[in-house]
Amino acid sequence: MDQSGMEIPVTLIIKAPNQKYSDQTISCFLNWTVGKLKTHLSNVYPSKPLTKDQRLVYSGRLLPDHLQLKDILRKQDEYHMVHLVCTSRTPPSSPKSSTNRESHEALASSSNSSSDHSGSTTPSSGQETLSLAVGSSSEGLRQRTLPQAQTDQAQSHQFPYVMQGNVDNQFPGQAAPPGFPVYPAFSPLQMLWWQQMYAHQYYMQYQAAVSAQATSNVNPTQPTTSQPLNLAHVPGEEPPPAPNLVAQENRPMNENVQMNAQGGPVLNEEDFNRDWLDWMYTFSRAAILLSIVYFYSSFSRFIMVMGAMLLVYLHQAGWFPFRQEGGHQQAPNNNAEVNNDGQNANNLELEEMERLMDDGLEDESGEDGGEDASAIQRPGLMASAWSFITTFFTSLIPEGPPQVAN
């Protein structure tokens, strides 16, 4: 019963992937193995493939020979699609050999036709035909290599640095692997000419790079060498550019100038284009603020607030600066002196050096004198308290506009 149940017929549709043969319908049994099915196909299939060359694929799976069909095929399908792939034992011939074979056959047929037409031919005429055939083939080879040689010349002209590495490989017999024929694209004279052109081009580029580097190295050294030369000519005096530098440092700057990102002064349109409506808005805000202070405080507080606002306004306008340094007051006087006589700067520097030397001698005179001077320079308690209070309250007031433009 089991064997009769196992021998159930099943229909397989064998498809060839190369579409060389049409789909073949094969009847077999479920108890067959894949190897037995291959043996059956080697007898039934039109191409008669060998068993070892067959590959059966079912549902994207390669079927091994030991499996049975009942374990592979789906029972709900009536027809089962199996793809047959056969390995090729004879490799395809190259088209180059076929063309050579055709050319040889054409030569043989032409020689036979010429011999039949002339009746009897001498060996010399046969040699002439062979020489003509060889000449035609050599002309074909020459025509075939001519475009390649032209492209090689163009490439070598565009990229001359490639020629240096390929010079040794172009000559026959040098750096050529054994067993390979060498067909040089250029003659030795052409190769020497290309090498000379490459050397000339390389020399010109090298000279340009060296000259550019020399000029870049000379330019930054000129300012550094000019100063020692001036010092050598005038050893006892300061160099002439010193008064100019002092004049530039003591030159009065334009105050209250704002700079924009492009480097020019900022033109504040609000200062120039303020119409009557803007002024009315400003006065109304000030009136509202003063009315609130007047009605919700006493008269004395109102006077204090008015005085504080007036003080802040004068400080913002620059009429009443709280933190004015002495350097800004002395700058116009120094600038006038420098403009009148350039030697005054040197005299001031000499006087400053003499004063420092005198101070150093006074400091070395005795320890008691130094202690007395330090005691005299120490501020008192009241002066410290007054400076602390004034500094604290003046720091609460906002600073005015910048005095020096950036």
UniProtKB/Swiss-Prot annotation:
Record localization: Membrane
Region described as Disordered: 86-154
Listed InterPro entries: HERPUD1/2, Ubiquitin-like_dom, Ubiquitin-like_domsf
Compositional bias (Polar residues): 127-154
Entry keyword annotation includes Transit peptide: no
CDD domains cross-referenced by the UniProt entry: Ubl_HERP2 (cd17119)
Ubiquitin-like domain sequence ranges: 10-89
Single biological process term from Gene Ontology: spermatogenesis
Biased composition (Low complexity): 87-98, 106-126
Main localization category: membrane
Keywords: Membrane, Transmembrane, Transmembrane helix, Unfolded protein response
Annotated signal peptide: none
GO CC annotation: membrane
Highest rank taxon of the organism: Eukaryota
Annotated transmembrane regions: 302-322
Role description: Could be involved in the unfolded protein response (UPR) pathway.
Name used for this protein in its record: Homocysteine-responsive endoplasmic reticulum-resident ubiquitin-like domain member 2 protein
Species of the source: Homo sapiens
Lineage, uppermost ranks: Eukaryota, Metazoa, Chordata, Craniata, Vertebrata
Gene from which this protein is expressed: HERPUD2
